[in-house]
């Protein structure tokens, strides 16, 4: 069996004799030559990814002013940085919004970071509390990346091994970290580099760990050299993540890009590339993983819960084709829909990361490192936060009516049951509209005769497993005082009103 060492591979790199290929190129080599010959021939496989990595940020040491200040509240271009460290140390997070509500997420922490990498001036404003050794109360200066002592990028969670795709079952579009999701499953968004993904290429499914990547692994980070410093937050193979660090002063704005997800927040697109030493045949075989080999779950992001419904399972080859067929339920009907797919990450840039890293190694500018420890194994635990669901406050049994009744008959139902909302259903109990006591009053004033003339047909609804908080937001957004609760087949199972929610929150107080 072929066995190499990183030391031997580094010697070949220094001599200009190493064979280095990208993960894309490795697929063809293994297909044509087999894993054994590929392991003998290839020394290093380069990988790459380029996507939105919200859990990113930079530690900055500004140097001491004269007289010195102990910074308490720190702002960079009006974006707050965390200052609970030493006197002039701070951490600026990529997802931090702007303090100006008119700017908000359009210019956040990610934009500050990109501006620094681009060499632009950034306004630093800091407030402090005075001490004998730090007498200054505030400072307001303009700085560039060259002016600060250190700017160390430390990203708690980057480089997802597997990223779920997203779709939306709701009747309105929603705004998420996966971009804008259209109503009624009308698009699917995905993220990730697939066959170029670093952790996919290094994963060992038998041990549920990684073959070569670990603490101390040298990497390509944002156009400079960085290191893996541990497993990332929420690391849980086969959903692995990495915590990485690198010198911001070495980085290239081509591979560090700020972005804003509409109505969600600012984020930082980061280019990460990791070299995988081909130490044996098994590693060579894994480095030939293809898009069609990587399973991607598609979840319904229209369901406002931590555990979202699984809609389908697919792979990156299908997702990259630009369309996908889903079997879904809409208004109680099982339908087959072919919809567009879209990526919120860049495969083109991921390829460029892998190609750039490959050239660095071929030029002898980048040597591999031995990991000093493997990545930890962790079990993700949910937050222990209480939640009240719609079914917990649901008014049952539902009082409903059919659309063929008169205005007077509807008014009698409202008075008899002391209610203000009356869902209108068809012969199968499926929701077709709703009327309120206000609708009745208007109908009488306008001499309307039938329910069909006055009912609202485009009805905002809720589900039993929906959080009450979310329903309250929905009612406020659409300026309504009640929502029918329906099942998966749009049959009415109850109703939630503003009075129900007021009683709930009043009881909490």
From Swiss-Prot:
- Keyword terms of this UniProt record: Amino-acid biosynthesis, CBS domain, Methionine biosynthesis, Repeat, Transferase
- List the active site: 133 (cysteine persulfide intermediate)
**UniProt entry tagged with the keyword Transferase:** yes
Task: Pinpoint the CBS domain residues.
Answer: 394-450, 455-509
* Binding site residues for S-methyl-5'-thioadenosine: 395, 399, 421, 497-500
Q: Set out the biological process GO terms recorded for this chain's protein.
A: methionine biosynthetic process
The entry summarizes how activity is regulated as: The ligand-induced conformational reorganization of the protein could be an important regulatory mechanism.
Q: Name one Pfam family in it.
A: CBS
**One example GO MF annotation:** transferase activity
- Identify the CDD domains for this entry: CBS_pair_arch_MET2_assoc (cd04605)
What EC number(s) has UniProt assigned to this enzyme? 2.8.1.16
Q: SMART domains under this entry?
A: CBS (SM00116)
According to its UniProt record, in which pathway does this protein act? Answer: Amino-acid biosynthesis
- Catalysed reactions, semicolon-separated: L-aspartate 4-semialdehyde + reduced 2[4Fe-4S]-[ferredoxin] + hydrogen sulfide + 3 H(+) = oxidized 2[4Fe-4S]-[ferredoxin] + L-homocysteine + H2O
**Residues given in the record as S-adenosyl-L-methionine binding sites:** 439, 456, 460, 479-482
So what does this one do? Required for O-acetylhomoserine sulfhydrylase (OAHS)-independent homocysteine (Hcy) biosynthesis. Together with MJ0099, catalyzes the condensation of sulfide with aspartate semialdehyde to generate homocysteine. Likely functions through persulfide intermediate.
User: What protein family does this chain belong to?
Assistant: Belongs to the L-aspartate semialdehyde sulfurtransferase family.
According to the UniProt entry, the note on domains is: The C-terminal cystathionine beta-synthase (CBS) domains can bind different numbers of S-adenosyl-L-methionine (SAM) and S-methyl-5'-thioadenosine (MTA) ligands. Binding of SAM and MTA triggers a drastic conformational change in the protein, which evolves progressively from an open form in the absence of ligands to a closed form when the four sites are fully occupied.
Task: Report quaternary structure and partners.
Answer: Homodimer. May form a complex with MJ0099.
**Name under which the protein is recorded:** L-aspartate semialdehyde sulfurtransferase
Q: Which organism is it from?
A: Methanocaldococcus jannaschii (strain ATCC 43067 / DSM 2661 / JAL-1 / JCM 10045 / NBRC 100440) (Methanococcus jannaschii)
Q: What are the leading ranks of the lineage? A: Archaea, Methanobacteriati, Methanobacteriota, Methanomada group, Methanococci
């Amino acid at each position: 069996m072929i066995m190499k060492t990183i030391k031997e591979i580094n010697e070949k790199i220094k001599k200009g004799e190493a064979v280095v290929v990208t993960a894309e190129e490795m697929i063809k080599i293994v297909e044509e030559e087999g894993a054994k010959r590929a392991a003998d021939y290839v020394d290093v496989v380069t990988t790459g990814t380029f996507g939105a990595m919200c859990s990113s940020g930079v530690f900055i040491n500004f140097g001491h002013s004269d007289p010195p200040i102990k910074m308490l509240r720190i702002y960079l271009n009006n974006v707050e940085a965390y200052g609970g460290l030493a006197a002039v140390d701070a951490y600026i997070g990529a997802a931090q919004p702007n303090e100006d509500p008119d700017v908000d997420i359009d210019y956040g922490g990610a934009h500050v970071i990109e501006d620094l990498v681009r060499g632009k001036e950034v306004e630093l404003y800091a407030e402090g509390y005075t001490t004998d050794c730090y007498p200054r109360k505030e400072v307001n200066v303009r700085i560039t990346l060259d002016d600060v002592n250190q700017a160390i990028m430390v990203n708690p969670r980057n480089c997802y091994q597997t990223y779920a795709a997203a779709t939306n079952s709701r009747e309105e579009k929603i705004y998420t970290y996966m971009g804008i999701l259209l109503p009624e499953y009308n698009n699917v968004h995905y993220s990730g580099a697939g066959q170029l993904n670093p952790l996919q290429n290094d994963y060992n499914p038998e041990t549920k760990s990684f073959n070569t990547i670990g603490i101390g692994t040298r990497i390509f980070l944002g156009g400079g050299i960085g290191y893996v410093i541990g497993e990332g937050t929420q690391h849980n193979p086969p959903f692995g993540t990495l915590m990485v660090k690198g010198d911001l002063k070495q980085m290239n704005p081509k591979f560090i890009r700020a972005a804003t997800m509409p109505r969600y927040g600012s984020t930082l697109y980061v280019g990460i590339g990791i070299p995988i030493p081909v130490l044996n045949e098994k590693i060579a075989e894994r480095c030939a993983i293809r898009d069609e080999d990587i399973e991607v779950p598609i979840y319904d992001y229209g369901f406002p819960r931590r555990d979202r419904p699984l809609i389908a399972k697919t792979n990156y080859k299908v997702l990259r084709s630009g369309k996908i067929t889903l079997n879904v339920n809409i208004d109680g009907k099982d339908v087959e829909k072919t919809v567009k797919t879209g990526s919120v990450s860049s495969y083109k840039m991921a390829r460029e990361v892998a190609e750039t890293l490959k050239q660095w190694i071929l030029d002898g500018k980048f040597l591999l490192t031995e990991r000093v420890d493997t990545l930890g194994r962790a079990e993700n635990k949910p937050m222990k936060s209480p939640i009240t669901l719609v079914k917990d406050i649901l008014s049952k049994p539902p009082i409903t009516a059919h659309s063929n009744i008169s205005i007077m008959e509807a008014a009698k139902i409202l008075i008899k049951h002391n209610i203000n909302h009356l869902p209108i259903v068809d012969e199968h109990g499926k929701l077709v509209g709703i009327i309120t006591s206000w609708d009745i009053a208007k109908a009488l004033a306008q001499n309307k005769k039938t329910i069909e003339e006055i009912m609202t047909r485009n009805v905002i609804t809720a589900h039993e497993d929906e959080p009450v908080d979310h329903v309250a937001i929905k009612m406020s957004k659409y300026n309504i005082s009640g929502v029918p609760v329906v099942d998966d087949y749009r049959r009415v199972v109850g109703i939630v009103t503003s009075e129900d929610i007021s009683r709930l929150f009043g009881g909490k107080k």
